[in-house]
Structure formats: structure tokens, C-alpha cells
UniProtKB/Swiss-Prot annotation:
Biased composition (Basic and acidic residues): 23-32, 190-201, 212-237
Protein name per UniProt: DNA-directed RNA polymerase I subunit rpa34
Chain segments carrying region Disordered: 1-66, 163-251
Source species taxonomy: Eukaryota, Fungi, Dikarya, Ascomycota, Taphrinomycotina
Primary location group: nucleus
Bias kind Acidic residues: ranges: 8-17
Source organism superkingdom: Eukaryota
Gene Ontology BP, a term: transcription by RNA polymerase I
S-S pairs: none
Gene from which the chain derives: rpa34
Keywords: DNA-directed RNA polymerase, Nucleus, Phosphoprotein, Transcription
Signal peptide: none
């Protein structure tokens, strides 16, 4: 995985122009190299590597929800099969808009940025699996470009005219979080109020359904009895008045 996953990144059209200028510089230096020693040629190649080192830096944009994802026309979150080789990734036919696959069960989400029709950026976890769904700590980038190629054996990067040469370099750098690939966070299930729950437990204990039903009936009877007694107490003074008035009438 470590060898096949070594990629190099190319920035968008702005970087392509800077790359072409590097290529022009390299071609203009060729006559001097033919006259001078091989050592000087090697130093020129190292200078070229230093000049394009800035193009190897890439930073992902944060994508928080599927709605934000739709707004970002050049940023796509996709899932790739585990153990996919660099060559297989470079042969991906993404077209103008890669398909977005969102699955909640898998936390490993990869970000593809399409720089042009022939340039695709892929962020992958490193060989130790040093990757979380919120932050890519170390990533790999692969891009196809006709302008620069890297000699994997020597590590020297030189301009080339060959079309769509895959460049591979291991990028040891930090990326910004890409956020949640699933969408808006799901609301936690509402738990019953602790007070009500405790009160029910205190009242019921380990009682069976029948016992609870009987208790309920008894409570209803007690309530009815209490209401009757209250009513009787309220009606007692009225009854006394009625008795007194009836006695007066008889007299």
C-alpha cells in the first residue's frame, strides 16, 4: 500500500500555468546542461523539484452537510473500495461530476476534488489507517497531468510531454476537516422525564398488572367516597336551616 499509494498533487488552472512556466524554464536550461557537467544537470533537476514543491500542497474544503456538498461544485465525497491501488484510482472515469455515495455505516469517507476534466484529487487514509471522519491527518493525492511526472526511483520530478502521466507522492501534511458526510445530525431520542419515571417506579414497585388494576380501582373508590363526604358536609348546614324553618311554620 505504501509504494502504490505514493501520489503527487496538482493545483487547479492557476497552478497549471505556473507548471508550464517551469517547463519553459526547464527547456531553456537544456542547452546549458548539454555544455556543463552532469552534476550541474542534477542540481538543475533538484531546483525544478524545489520550484514545484508548492504544487504538491493541497488542502480540503470543509463540507458539513449534503446541502453544503451541493453548493460546492468542485468538491465531492465518495467511497472507494479498500485496498484500491494507485493505478486503479487513476483510471477512475469521474466525468464532469463524480457520483456521490453516502452511507452511514462506514466512517471512512474520501474526498475527490475535480480540478479539470483530466485531473482528479483523491484523499485516502495512510497505511496505518491514521484517518478519522472529522479530520484527515495524513493523506495521499493522485492526479493525472500532461505537464509533470515523477521518477519514483530517484524522487526527481521533471516536466514531460507524455499525456496523462500519473504522478504519485505521499503527502505528509494536515488537511482541514471535511465534516459530516451523512448530512444533518440525527436528533437524539427523547427520554421520559426522570421525575415521572421515578414516581411510577415508587408507586408500582414489582407489582403485577392485576394488582395495579386493583389498586387503581381502590383509588377511584376512595376518590368517590371523599367527594361524597365533602358533599354531605356542605349540605349539613342547609338541612339544619330547612328543619328550623319547618318547625317555625308548624308553630
Amino acid at each position: 500500500m505504501a509504494k502504490s499509494s505514493e501520489f503527487v498533487n496538482e493545483e487547479s488552472s492557476e497552478d497549471e500555468s505556473s507548471v508550464s512556466s517551469i517547463e519553459d524554464q526547464h527547456s531553456s536550461k537544456e542547452p546549458e546542461q548539454s555544455v556543463e557537467s552532469n552534476n550541474h544537470g542534477e542540481s538543475n533537476a533538484q531546483e525544478d523539484v524545489a520550484e514545484i514543491a508548492g504544487l504538491e500542497k493541497v488542502q480540503g474544503k470543509p463540507v458539513l452537510t449534503t446541502n453544503d456538498l451541493k453548493k460546492e461544485s468542485n468538491v465531492f465525497l465518495v467511497r472507494l473500495p479498500p485496498g484500491m491501488s494507485a493505478d486503479q484510482i487513476s483510471q477512475l472515469k469521474v466525468g464532469s461530476k463524480p457520483t456521490v455515495e453516502l452511507k452511514q455505516e462506514n466512517e471512512n469517507t474520501y474526498q475527490i476534488r475535480e480540478e479539470s476534466t483530466s485531473s482528479v484529487r483523491v484523499f485516502l487514509p495512510d497505511e496505518q489507517g491514521s484517518y478519522t471522519s472529522n479530520e484527515i491527518k495524513t493523506g495521499y493525492v493522485i492526479t493525472e497531468t500532461p505537464k509533470i511526472s515523477q521518477n519514483i526511483d530517484t524522487g526527481i520530478t521533471i516536466p514531460t510531454q507524455a499525456p496523462l502521466v500519473p504522478q504519485r507522492k505521499n503527502l505528509r501534511q494536515h488537511f482541514r476537516p471535511i465534516g459530516d458526510a451523512v448530512g444533518p445530525e440525527s436528533e437524539p431520542e427523547a427520554e421520559p422525564k426522570s421525575g415521572i419515571k421515578e414516581h411510577i417506579l415508587q408507586e408500582t414497585g414489582d407489582a403485577t398488572v392485576e394488582e395495579l388494576q386493583n389498586k387503581g380501582k381502590e383509588k377511584q373508590k376512595e376518590l368517590k367516597k371523599g367527594k361524597r363526604e365533602k358533599k354531605d358536609e356542605e349540605e349539613k348546614p342547609k338541612k339544619k336551616k330547612q328543619k328550623k324553618s319547618s318547625k317555625k311554620e308548624k308553630n
